[in-house]
């Protein structure tokens, strides 16, 4: 249809989110969508009228250094063509800013009308001389705000405020009540958030206490933990989160020391209290970074009742289109990628292109990142193509810390961090920040990627993920993605596959099934980072193994699965030294191996030539049983019970007649538990020996007996639980459950 439709309510929009089509849930790409109609430039007078009517009010952070300005004073020539040099712009702007708070505030507008449609779009382009952020920083920064207008109904249909790169979902609002968009600019990066309710100086992601949200982006699909979080970048520093800024360097030195920037001083960058020199300078994430505060407010100079104390000029974008290029040596940022031996430092470059060279300059609908918004406009206007479907990558980035529920140094939990992280795909040079701990990468091409996540003060995380062609199995109607192929049911690795369901479902354990087109990264969608001071590198050295390893997973006794990824040969992951871990490996035949890891004070732990099959799993049973017996003894030292055992055990997995060192019921209960555990360990040793010698029937007999013995050990644990400190009892339960699962795997294993 070409006319306007009915206004969508917030409730209706949320209903559409829950019941959205596969394409909507997939995280659609404008480049993969149906083509939009062509646009033409609106005539000068009409364009000016529309631009003045919808001109945004711009709210800046109190620490902002680079306000929207006119780049033309910094023009020069290169080979006869007009260019703007990064050195000239930054140095010249800094010099002018020493004399006036906001040098030549300017906003450029570009108004496009879709052919044969009442849909017209007013674009507001904001140029800043520099961009300083937590990762990406560059000379010249162009940001855009779109107002989609129905000229027949004379009302705004959609506000779109750009957020970082095309990988990040924009802040968008369908059918806004407010005609004039109020925009909150992110410090340093100038990413734009919307503020359309009565709380003018803050961003509100969801409706609270009757105050409507500032965006109508649909919820994040694929993770139950993020099911209520709208997929929009927002404004993290205004939402209770922190972003440490990094000082940009050129030729190994801070930019303010460069001889071509004589007017630039340290004070011309984001203040020191908000910055760090590098992410690995800290032993833990920073907790003392100040929150966002409103500073300069800019309003259109022609508005009768302006909100701000400063005013900007509104200039047609065509007046600056003659500039051939915005130049400057590429700045880089350091990004740590975990390696088996040493971590690599990837220097990734960022750049900015002039607006008039970008597809969205003439086709603004290409910048709609929310599929439900695009679908709504496509239903109302023939000029907008229906959304398509390509891969999206999602995860929740948390932090791993010790838990009081476990013995000291033997267990973790994960929790939300107040410090945002940044992610990088090996295939893309632009890093993407999280928002509220949510990692959302849009328009990820099909194929295998390496995802790396950094956070200030934490060790880096990296894993391989595979994104399928979103429409490969469904004629292009919906997508399907997975981190790796489905695994055998007898393993404990969590896999990500998609189904034909049209809405997101939740499994019995609370894990959301991935909607079509969504790849869930991490372990069950969670990426727990470890503070640098607590990090231990866990290496899996596959060199010399007799099988090809395909997957590695790491599970803490209390926090559960923390790492789960496909691998190519050797692998490395950082773990918290306060955890107690089971490391699982899988080979290309589907055989599983398991190993206990207790890093404690180690700087690195290596699993050499990991094996898969019965022998590996039986050896694991021996290790975890002895470890649990030691935990029980240590917890009861100095108390009645828990005395020594003869370390024996019979071939059927029962304990010998050793009596231990204590007397009374408590001694019997605790002593019986430790004897049961050590008997299991001794029998597991025999099972491993038989498997290694090729005696499969003998190994299975020992494993069957161990299964029964583990059941008795669990009974004795409950008998002794009143005499054990809570953390020790908790650890014993978790490890016995782990041993039972691995025992079943060992029995089912065909490989010795």
Where do the PLM segments sit?
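N-terminal secretory signal peptides and thylakoid transit peptides that target proteins
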Residues: 2-20
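Short N-terminal edge-element motif at the start of the domain
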Residues: 70-144, 148-158, 422-424
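Domain-length functional cores that host ligand/cofactor binding and catalytic or interaction surfaces
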Residues: 135-146, 152-392, 415-418
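Structured interaction patches on ligand/partner-binding surfaces of diverse proteins
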Residues: 456-485, 490, 500-523, 588-614
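Long, charged/polar, soluble alpha-helical segments
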Residues: 618-752
């Amino acid at each position: 249809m070409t006319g306007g439709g009915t206004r969508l309510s917030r409730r209706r929009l949320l209903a559409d989110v829950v019941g959205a089509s596969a394409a909507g849930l997939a995280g659609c790409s404008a480049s993969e969508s149906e083509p939009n109609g062509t646009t033409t430039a609106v005539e000068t007078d009409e364009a000016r009228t529309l631009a003045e009517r919808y001109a945004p009010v711009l709210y800046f952070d109190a620490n902002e250094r680079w306000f929207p300005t006119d780049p033309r004073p910094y023009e020069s020539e290169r080979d006869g063509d007009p260019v703007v040099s990064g050195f000239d712009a930054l140095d010249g702007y800094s010099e002018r800013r020493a004399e006036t708070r906001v040098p030549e505030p300017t906003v450029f507008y570009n108004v496009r009308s879709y052919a044969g449609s009442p849909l017209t779009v007013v674009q507001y382009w904001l140029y800043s001389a520099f961009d300083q952020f937590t990762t990406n920083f560059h000379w010249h920064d162009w940001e855009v705000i779109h107002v989609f207008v129905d000229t027949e109904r004379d009302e705004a249909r959609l506000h779109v405020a750009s957020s970082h790169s095309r990988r990040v979902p924009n802040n968008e609002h369908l059918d806004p009540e407010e005609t004039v968009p109020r925009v909150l600019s992110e410090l340093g990066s100038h990413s734009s958030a919307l503020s359309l309710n009565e709380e003018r100086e803050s961003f509100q992601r969801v409706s609270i206490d009757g105050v409507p949200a500032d965006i109508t982006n649909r919820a994040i699909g694929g993770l139950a933990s993020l099911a209520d979080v709208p997929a929009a970048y927002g404004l993290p520093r205004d939402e209770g989160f922190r972003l440490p800024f990094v000082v940009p360097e050129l030729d190994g030195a801070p930019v303010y020391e460069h001889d071509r920037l004589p007017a630039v001083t340290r004070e011309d960058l984001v203040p020191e209290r908000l910055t760090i020199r590098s992410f690995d300078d800290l032993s833990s994430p920073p907790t003392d970074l100040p929150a966002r505060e409103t500073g300069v407010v800019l309003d259109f100079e022609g508005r009768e009742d302006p909100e701000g104390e400063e005013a900007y000029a509104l200039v047609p974008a065509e007046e600056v289109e003659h500039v051939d290029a915005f130049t400057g040596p590429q700045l880089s940022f350091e990004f740590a990628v975990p390696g088996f031996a040493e971590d690599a430092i990837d220097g990734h470059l960022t750049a900015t292109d002039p607006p008039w060279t970008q597809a969205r300059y003439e086709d603004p609908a290409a910048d709609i990142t929310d599929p439900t918004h695009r679908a709504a406009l496509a239903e109302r206007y023939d000029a907008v193509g229906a959304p398509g479907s390509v891969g999206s990558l999602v995860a929740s980035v948390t932090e791993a810390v010790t838990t009081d529920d476990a013995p000291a140094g033997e267990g973790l939990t994960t929790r939300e961090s107040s410090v945002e992280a940044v992610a990088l795909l090996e295939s893309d040079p632009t890093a993407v920040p999280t928002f509220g701990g949510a990692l959302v990468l849009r328009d990820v091409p099909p194929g295998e990627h390496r995802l790396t996540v950094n956070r200030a003060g934490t060790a880096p995380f990296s894993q391989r993920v595979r994104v399928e062609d979103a429409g490969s199995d469904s004629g292009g109607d919906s997508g399907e993605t997975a981190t790796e192929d489905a695994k055998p049911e007898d393993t404990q690795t969590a896999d990500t596959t998609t189904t034909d369901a049209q809405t997101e479902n939740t499994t019995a354990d609370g894990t959301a099934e991935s909607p079509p087109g969504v790849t869930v990264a991490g372990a069950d969608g969670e990426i727990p980072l470890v503070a640098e001071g607590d990090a231990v590198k866990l290496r899996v050295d596959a060199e010399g193994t007799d099988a090809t390893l395909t997957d590695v997973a790491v599970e803490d006794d209390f926090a559960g699965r923390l790492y789960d990824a496909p691998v190519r040969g050797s692998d490395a992951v950082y773990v918290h030294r306060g955890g107690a871990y089971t490391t699982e490996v899988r080979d290309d035949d589907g055989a599983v191996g398991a190993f206990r890891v207790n890093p404690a004070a180690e700087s690195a732990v290596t699993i050499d030539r990991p094996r898969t099959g019965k022998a590996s799993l039986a050896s694991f049973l021996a290790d975890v049983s002895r470890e649990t017996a030691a935990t029980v003894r240590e917890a009861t030292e100095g108390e009645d019970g828990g005395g020594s055992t003869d370390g024996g055990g019979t071939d059927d997995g029962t304990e010998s007649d050793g009596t231990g060192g204590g007397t009374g019921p408590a001694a019997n209960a605790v002593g019986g538990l430790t004897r049961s555990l050590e008997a299991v360990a001794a029998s597991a040793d025999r099972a491993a020996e038989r498997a290694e010698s090729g005696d499969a029937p003998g190994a299975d007999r020992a494993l069957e007996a161990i299964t029964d013995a583990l059941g008795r050990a669990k009974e004795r644990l409950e008998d002794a639980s009143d005499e054990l400190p809570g953390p020790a009892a908790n650890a014993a339960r978790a490890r016995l459950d782990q041993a039972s699962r691995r025992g079943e795997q060992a029995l089912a294993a065909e490989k010795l």
